[in-house]
From Swiss-Prot:
This is Large ribosomal subunit protein uL6. Part of the 50S ribosomal subunit. SUPFAM superfamilies: Ribosomal protein L6. The lineage of its organism: Bacteria, Bacillati, Bacillota, Clostridia, Thermoanaerobacterales. Belongs to the universal ribosomal protein uL6 family. GO terms for cellular component: cytosolic large ribosomal subunit.
Length: 180
């Protein structure tokens, strides 16, 4: 059995988990509601204030989906209670971020500012002009929006300029050594 998959998920107070016969899991909490459909190769049941995930067979695909399904449901429960956040920092002279209504405007060395629209269920906060925080209840969406922001100007390998995750270490390459 999958080591992660066999662990039951405790349902905290104030969280409601429903599973339909066609494997659609709905998690309701104080921060919102999440819904996701899972493949029929896993069984999901709610009993004794716990969510238990089991698999129907022992194929390689079923074993993989067992742990994955359990981890996704655990993240859904955590999302509706605590939420998720990802922080990014902007490094570089003249590089800055600003919030204009529901848009994030990035000035990161291009001839034009780059605008990123705020998606439903995702909140983008700008602290100062070089720190961006992405918050939401869906871990997958928070990570994807943060990755899209980072992709606008990835950290440069020679000077380290660009947008990076908070705490990300960028290894700098050595520049050319000129002839003497």
């Amino acid at each position: 059995m999958s080591r992660i998959g066999r662990l039951p998920i405790e349902i905290p107070k104030g969280v409601e988990v429903k599973v339909t016969p066609d494997n659609v899991v709905t998690v309701k909490g104080s921060k919102g509601t999440l819904e996701k459909k899972f493949p029929p190769i896993v069984n999901i049941e709610v009993k004794d204030n716990q969510v238990i995930v089991t698999r129907k067979g022992d194929d390689k695909e079923e074993k993989a989906m067992h742990g994955t399904t359990r981890a996704i449901i655990a993240n859904m429960v955590k999302g509706v209670t605590e939420g998720f956040e990802k922080a990014l920092e902007i490094v570089g002279i003249g590089y800055r971020a600003a919030k204009q209504g529901k848009k994030l405007v990035l000035n990161v060395g291009y001839s034009h500012p780059v605008e990123i629209e705020e998606k439903p269920g995702i909140e983008i906060i700008v602290e100062g002009n070089n720190k961006i925080i992405v918050r939401g209840i869906d871990k997958e969406k928070v990570g994807q929006v943060a990755a899209n922001i980072r992709r606008v100007r990835e950290p440069d390998a020679y000077q380290g300029k660009g947008i990076r995750y908070a705490g990300e270490v960028v290894r700098l390459k050595e520049g050319k050594t000129g002839k003497k």
